[in-house]
Design a protein with these regions (language model features):
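Acidic, metal/ion-coordinating pockets
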Residues: 20-275, 305-316, 326, 362, ...
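N-terminal leader/targeting segments
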Residues: 10-12, 202
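C-terminal motif of bacterial Sec signal peptides marking the signal peptidase cleavage site
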Residues: 15-18
Length: 474
């Protein structure tokens, strides 16, 4: 009798095990802020292919800013197309928009979206123009019966009211609050999905702010915009970001028990750990075979760091406009350094990839002070606040209180009350708050062209890496 009972218990246990939900693993591979760095794409291809060889359920995701940052992509016959062609071939599944997707205008972006073989989702862009398609707010991907929902959002904080960029790029488009849209579509999509992912180009600070509200129903946030390496858990949601420039790939492992999420893990994997895929390497080399971009146009007599490059650009806009003072925003300096020796056109376009124009006006020291203090204390763009953002040809000192709020700006070489001729980038002119001036205008002179001309005419250039601006606490 006992033997029969034991056999019955074993049979019941076996039946229970057979009926238990099957455990499976879903892998989300993610990139963000690739900024046209196709030189690293062959290593990305190797990493993705290695994962697909070992994992059955894989989704490849990008969180925006696919171009702007590499002349071989940005100045291709169709700007941006080398990156999109490589992404199509590798088989990206879904992406959202970044602010730099709009750099060439919305009509161009609309045409580029038609060239993308992957789904582009964005819940907080509303189009009222025929030049730009109305994008879906989300998509649902099925992997072996597991339904994964992806909601996309893009920043609207820097515009204000739209992503950072020229106002003309956003005519006819509205950008509702990305956090509100993320919450709205999470509530709508959650009942339909086993896994819910927010693909965000708001920045990790805004992502964390959203999750801290405690209303999120997302399992994972795949983030971008702020170029940070992020791996943190907030309110049960995993918040991730891989940095920038295809230096890393994000690997999110979602353990599923039946149709329930049993656990989520994340790793940032350096792509330097992978050998380049040979076929992708050949394609990239073909894109780089451009003698017009490769040939040095001049020389640096010494290595330039980021401060030195910013000093050079501020001086260049001032010289071109015959101004007394030049300002350049540090966010527009897109390289961290350039070594001594030959400097190619590609390097200059990598330093200044936006087609930035020179703007000129007249300002008093009081008006310059107001501009600098406003930017330093910026309550909206927290990542750009409380740092020296405006590099200038004239020295100045920002005086702060104990809480690091700017109180004053001292100009040792300027005379109070006098009007000075001032030159800035058109990005500053169009977008910075509390700008007061007289006689302002945007010229047709491009910053990159000015830098190239200087290299051709005055090489070797000696770059001054000495910071002219500093912050002191009162």
């Amino acid at each position: 009798m006992k033997g029969i009972l034991r056999m019955g218990l074993v049979a019941v246990a076996a039946l229970a095990a057979a009926c238990a939900p099957r455990e499976r693993t879903l892998v989300l591979l993610s990139t963000n802020d690739m900024h046209a760095k196709i030189q690293n794409f062959p290593r990305l291809a190797s990493a993705v292919e290695a994962c697909r060889d070992t994992a059955q359920l894989v989704v490849l995701v990008d969180a925006g800013d696919r171009w702007t940052g590499n002349a071989y992509v940005d100045m291709a016959p169709t700007p941006g197309m080398p990156m999109i062609a490589l992404m199509n071939e590798l088989g990206f599944d879904v992406a959202t928009l970044g602010n730099h997707e709009f750099d060439h205008g919305q009509a161009f972006l609309g045409r580029m979206i038609d060239s993308m073989d992957f789904e582009v989702v964005c819940a907080n862009v509303v189009s009222d123009t025929c030049t730009f398609p109305q994008l879906p707010p989300y998509t649902v991907i099925d992997r072996d019966g597991i339904r994964i929902g992806f909601v996309g959002v893009v920043t609207n904080y820097e515009g204000p009211g739209h992503p950072a960029g020229n106002e003309s790029s956003f005519a006819g488009l509205e950008f509702p609050d990305p956090q509100a849209m993320a919450l709205k579509y999470a509530a709508e999509l959650r009942p339909e999905c086993d896994v819910l992912v927010l693909v965000s180009h708001m920045g990790d600070d805004r992502d964390a702010e959203l999750l801290a509200k405690g209303q999120s129903q997302y399992d994972v946030v795949i983030g971008g915009h702020t170029h940070e390496e992020v791996d943190t858990l907030i309110g049960g949601t995993l918040l991730t970001q891989t940095g920038k420039d295809l230096r890393n790939i994000g690997v999110t492992t979602v353990r599923m028990k039946g149709h329930k999420v049993a656990g989520v893990d994340y790793r940032i994997v350096p792509l330097a750990d992978y050998e380049p895929d040979i076929l992708y390497q050949k394609q990239v080399e073909a894109y780089y075979a451009d003698p017009g971009l490769n040939k040095p146009v001049g020389r640096f007599g010494n290595a330039a760091d980021k401060w030195g490059l910013a000093n050079w650009m501020a001086a260049a806009v001032a010289d071109e406009a015959d101004a007394d003072v030049g300002f350049y925003h540090i966010g527009g300096v897109r390289l961290d350094s350039i070594p001594a020796g030959g400097v190619s056109a590609a390097k200059v376009y990598g330093l200044e990839p936006f087609g930035t124009l020179v703007a000129r006006m007249e300002m008093t020291p009081a008006q310059m002070r107001r501009m600098i203090v406003s930017k330093y204390n910026d309550p909206v763009n927290a990542k750009e606040a409380h740092r020296i953002d405006l590099i200038s040809t004239t020295p100045y000192v920002i005086v702060t209180d104990a809480a690091d709020n700017a109180l004053d700006v001292q100009f040792p070489k300027l005379r109070e009350g006098r009007k000075y001729k001032v030159a800035v980038s058109d990005y500053i002119y169009r977008n910075y708050k509390d700008m007061e001036y007289t006689g302002g205008e945007i010229t047709v002179e491009k910053v990159a062209d000015i830098l190239l001309e200087e290299l051709r005419d005055d090489s070797p250039l000696k770059i001054d890496n000495t910071p002219r601006q500093r912050v002191v606490r009162k």
